Swiss-Prot record:
One of its GO terms (molecular function) is magnesium ion binding. This is DNA polymerase IV. PANTHER family: DNA POLYMERASE KAPPA, DNA REPAIR POLYMERASE UMUC / TRANSFERASE FAMILY MEMBER. Monomer. Binds 2 magnesium ions per subunit. The record marks 16 as: Substrate discrimination.
Length: 356
């Protein structure tokens, strides 16, 4: 395990909302919600910290957000402007290193082991980047500093907003032991529910399990979690990373025969895929359905649409059509997955912030 790398994860604080509050003084100090008209079927893209105090969060239906925060200010947002500001932030990063791996408009990994300024302390690099972003752009960022990407990302969320958390190799396991497993990068709702059923709530709980037992219960997730909680993750910062597909799949606790359960899973997946596509500023043209039967036979079916989309309803309709064509209801299903491929950058004027 290489512990000599110096990795920073920068995560902008409530990015879209903060840009709007910076540019529009009338929004400052008020609950601002970006996601469109609450009277329509939309989702929250992000919201200000003032709105979060009411329980509003990203991916929440705007109607629900309006009930939680009746005095909230709802706007559609300006994606082209957010991209412009994101590029300004990226330019600040590039003053320190060219090894930058963007995850979305508002977050990125930086490898500053050998940085352009010759600074020995990654902590000082992170602080300087935070200060520069604030001084030049009037925005705050949180930072996590560690020797691998997994820990750096968790650390960046530890002291939001405008915080910095440093985790050394010596501190890594103790730090991870206190973290709820729901905060582990890559642990989604389904995996979290499985972990909770196993009595695993924190990193400390996770460490009590053997590698074999975790793999038996969680398959590939178990393999990765066993290593992550011990600080064993050597994924490099990849400046050339480009997502070729966006998808979601789940293994059922019990084999499923009911097509309605399968369709419900596809609807949930479509919403999650839409959310990720919007964050990546991409849309796709090919929908792929994956089914694994109880005997472990696996099939994949795909449908190429007439136009590119990041719309959950269109993605779901295509996946549901593939399901009806593929599944007879005679054999039970162990796993179902939905993926959108054939991706390309979305034109800003067409980018959907409203969701469903």
């Amino acid at each position: 395990m290489d512990t000599s790398r110096k990795i920073i994860h920068i995560d902008m604080d409530a990015f879209y909302a903060s840009v709007e509050q910076r540019d529009h003084p009338e929004f400052r100090g008020k609950p601002l919600i970006i996601g469109g008209d609450p009277n329509k079927r939309g989702v929250v893209a992000t919201c200000s910290y003032e709105a979060r105090k009411f329980g509003v969060h990203s991916a929440m239906p705007t109607r629900q957000a309006a009930k939680l925060c009746p005095n909230g200010i709802f706007i559609h947002g300006n994606m082209a402007h957010y991209v412009e500001v994101s590029n300004q932030i990226r330019e600040i990063f590039s003053r320190y290193t060219d090894i930058i791996e963007p995850l979305s408009l508002d977050e990125a990994y930086l490898d500053v082991t050998e940085n352009k300024k010759g600074m020995k302390s990654a902590t000082m690099v992170a602080r300087e980047i935070q200060q520069t972003i604030y001084q030049e752009l009037g925005l705050t960022a949180s930072a996590g500093v560690s020797f691998n990407k997994f820990i750096a990302k968790i650390a960046s969320d530890f002291k939001k907003p405008a915080g910095i958390t440093v985790v050394t190799p010596e501190e890594a396991e103790a730090f991870l032991e206190q973290i709820p497993v729901t905060k582990f990068y890559g642990v989604g709702k389904v995996t979290a529910e499985k972990l909770h059923r196993l009595g695993i709530e924190t990193g400390a709980d996770l460490k009590k399990w053997s590698e074999w037992d975790l793999i038996r219960e969680l398959h590939k997730h178990g393999y990765h979690l066993y290593r992550h909680v011990r600080g064993r993750s050597n994924n490099i910062v990849n400046p050339h990373r480009d997502r070729k597909s966006v998808g979601k799949e789940t293994t059922f606790e019990f084999n499923v025969l009911d097509s309605r359960v399968l369709e419900q899973s596809l609807m949930q997946f479509a919403k999650k895929v839409e959310e990720r596509l919007i964050k990546l500023q991409k849309h796709g043209k090919t929908v792929v359905l994956k089914l694994r039967y109880s005997d472990f036979t696996t099939i994949t079916k795909r449908l190429t649409l007439n136009e590119y989309t990041n719309d959950a309803s269109q993605i779901y309709q295509a996946a549901a059509l593939l399901l009806r064509e593929s599944y007879t209801g005679q054999d039970s299903i162990r796993l179902i997955g939905l993926t959108v491929t054939n991706l390309k950058p979305v034109y800003f004027e067409n980018l959907r912030l409203e969701g469903l």
